[in-house]
């Protein structure tokens, strides 16, 4: 059986890691051992933050809706409860966009929520 030397696969693996770590600072982009550690850490951060991004955006939408609703004399909690009672099913992302871009339309939505709360 022929002897297998693994230089080709090692070189390919090193090249792959160094290409992925391109742009890292210092020896993190040129030294394989350091680059591998930094790349693994970067991938862990990326995985974690893809999940955190969803939480962060939801919190941002809620803050924007709350700020817009308080101008109309309601709290966020009561507004969402009013929307539910009124049967209006608009998600927070769209509500935040409407509040941010189109104040008149948002005011109408708030009026409907207030009417449902009063009833």
UniProtKB/Swiss-Prot annotation:
For molecular function, the Gene Ontology terms on record are: rRNA binding; structural constituent of ribosome
HAMAP family referenced in this protein's UniProt entry, alphabetically: Ribosomal_bL20
Which organism does this sequence originate in? Gluconacetobacter diazotrophicus (strain ATCC 49037 / DSM 5601 / CCUG 37298 / CIP 103539 / LMG 7603 / PAl5)
User: What family is reported?
Assistant: Belongs to the bacterial ribosomal protein bL20 family.
Name which cysteines form disulfide bonds: none
Describe the function of this protein: Binds directly to 23S ribosomal RNA and is necessary for the in vitro assembly process of the 50S ribosomal subunit. It is not involved in the protein synthesizing functions of that subunit.
Keyword flag RNA-binding: yes
Q: What is this protein called?
A: Large ribosomal subunit protein bL20
Q: Which CDD domains match?
A: Ribosomal_L20
By its UniProt entry, which Pfam families does this protein fall under?
Ribosomal_L20 (PF00453)
Q: Which UniProt keywords apply?
A: Ribonucleoprotein, Ribosomal protein, RNA-binding, rRNA-binding
Q: Which residues form a coiled coil?
A: none
Q: Which GO terms describe its biological process?
A: ribosomal large subunit assembly; translation
In the UniProt record, does the keyword Mitochondrion occur?
no
* GO CC annotation: ribonucleoprotein complex; ribosome
Q: Which InterPro entries match?
A: Ribosomal_bL20, RIBOSOMAL_L20_CS, Ribosomal_protein_bL20_C
Record's PROSITE patterns? Answer: RIBOSOMAL_L20 (PS00937)
């Amino acid at each position: 059986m022929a002897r297998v030397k693994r230089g080709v696969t090692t070189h390919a693996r090193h090249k792959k890691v160094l290409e992925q770590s391109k742009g890292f600072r210092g020896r993190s982009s040129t030294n394989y051992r350091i680059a591998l550690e930094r790349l693994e850490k970067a991938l862990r951060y990326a995985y974690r933050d893809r999940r955190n991004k969803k939480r962060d955006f939801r919190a941002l939408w809620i803050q924007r809706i709350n700020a817009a609703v308080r101008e109309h004399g309601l709290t966020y909690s009561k507004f969402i409860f009013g929307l539910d009672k009124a049967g209006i099913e608009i998600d927070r992302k769209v509500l935040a966009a409407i509040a941010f871009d189109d104040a008149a339309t948002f005011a109408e939505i708030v009026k409907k929520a207030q009417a449902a709360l009063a009833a």
